[in-house]
Amino acid sequence: MKRYGIIGGTFDPIHYGHLYIAYEAKKQLNLDNVIFMPAGNPPHKEGKKVTDSLLRYKMVKKAIEDFSGFSISDYEIDKKGFSYTYETLEHFKNNDVELFFITGADCLMDIETWERADTILSLCNLVVFSRGGFSNKNLIKQKEYIEKKYSVNIIVLPLKRLEISSTDIRKRINNKERVDFFVPRSIIKLIEENSLYKEE
């Protein structure tokens, strides 16, 4: 049986933190492939300005091209309407594939507010990594609660903390600050060519 990881996000823009998480997940969980899933129209981003999906797709594709075992899917950006995680998992789930959905600890804290959370937890192994602002105590407490309620096993991915965020990168670009220690040079080139993250 193939072991596929799915890492979703707006990737606006993709940065070294995303690549590090995917690399460590692939290595630690012995995954055959990690699929990057740029979000099309995510419900939790409604009302927020998000870069055109095709440009975000292009940035992700460029960023992962030299990594073996990384791939990209346009499933969510091609979808009409909102992109729900349970639909994405249903699309990729089959008898020959075991799915690992990789997400931040913040998502575990509010997983029950997600559309059809029970379906999500039944379709995949939920893999969470700690991000800034979440104590291990709170994470463990929520992990135990979800595991008991839904009879699932949640995997906590031990990672070195990288304080990189797409929001901070966008602000730095708008302020004409350097971001080449956060973002691959090839992605900076695409950002510059398309004049992204500069306020009108």
Curated annotation (Swiss-Prot):
Reactions listed under catalytic activity: nicotinate beta-D-ribonucleotide + ATP + H(+) = deamido-NAD(+) + diphosphate
CDD domains (alphabetical): NMNAT (cd02165)
Molecular function terms from GO: ATP binding; nicotinate-nucleotide adenylyltransferase activity
The keyword NAD is annotated on this UniProt entry: yes
EC top class, as a word: transferase
SUPFAM superfamilies linked: Nucleotidylyl transferase
Pathway: Cofactor biosynthesis; NAD(+) biosynthesis; deamido-NAD(+) from nicotinate D-ribonucleotide: step 1/1
EC number(s) stated in the UniProt entry for this protein: 2.7.7.18
Example GO biological process: NAD biosynthetic process
Pfam families xrefs: CTP_transf_like (PF01467)
Source species, domain of life: Bacteria
Keywords of the record: ATP-binding, NAD, Nucleotide-binding, Nucleotidyltransferase, Pyridine nucleotide biosynthesis, Transferase
Family, per entry: Belongs to the NadD family.
Function: Catalyzes the reversible adenylation of nicotinate mononucleotide (NaMN) to nicotinic acid adenine dinucleotide (NaAD).
Protein name: Probable nicotinate-nucleotide adenylyltransferase
Natural source organism: Clostridium botulinum (strain Eklund 17B / Type B)
